[in-house]
Amino acid sequence: MSSPKIVLYTNHLCPWAHRAHIALKEIGLEYEEVIIDLSTPREPWYLEINPVTRPRPHHHLRWNHCNRIRHRRPIPRRRPPNPPPPPSSPTENALYRARLSFFVDAFFSKVLPSFFASLRAANETERDAAAEQLVAAIVKEVEPLLADTEGKGPFFGGSDKLTLAEVQSGPFLLRTLSFAKPEHGLVSAKLSTLLEQAPRFKRWAEATATHESVNFIYDEKLVADKMRAKFAPAAKV
């Protein structure tokens, strides 16, 4: 049976839409891509299929397809080269899903606020402070949750393949690390050194950001330029 043809309404600048690309790349599902220009009013044809009071099509698609992926295993491909491992118990599955959800929530609620604070920073001093806060949150909230990666794969739970934790956090890890390059000036250049305080997280973040399924649509300079323009400090009167 052939896979259903789907249409992904998306924008490569959006980190939330980016997550759908990661999931679809990993499962090897072919799709037609329609880029939505977020800088202009929506076209009539777009509003016909997606009234403004409803979720965006790429959000609907993202959750429909991501939620069909088994949480307890790395994201499977449609035709895996080897037989899948035998199923584990319902209790183990439930615990894994809970751990993954807790991990992702810790990253988004405790770490990302400092990333956005860095984007809004008016000067290097504020960016350095945001980076220190970001790493402090990582050390306290996220680093301990990666203890089971010691001596194993770099991804969540010690997996050697992407899991839903990387699907959800990947676009933000990619932006955080790349924005720390001096040419972008959006995140403190001290970030790489600061992350040495959290070696498990650093390994996880770098492995995720360099994975082809995570970065294949990422235009670093374009995204950085757009973010700089969007979060530029307001001129003081």
Where on the chain are the PLM-derived regions?
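Surface-exposed helix-capping loop/turn segments at secondary-structure junctions
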Residues: 82, 144-158, 181-183, 211-218
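GST-like domain detector, emphasizing the conserved glutathione-binding G-site
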Residues: 1-154
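Short alpha-helical "patches" and their helix-cap loops
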Residues: 89-91, 119, 129-132, 182-203
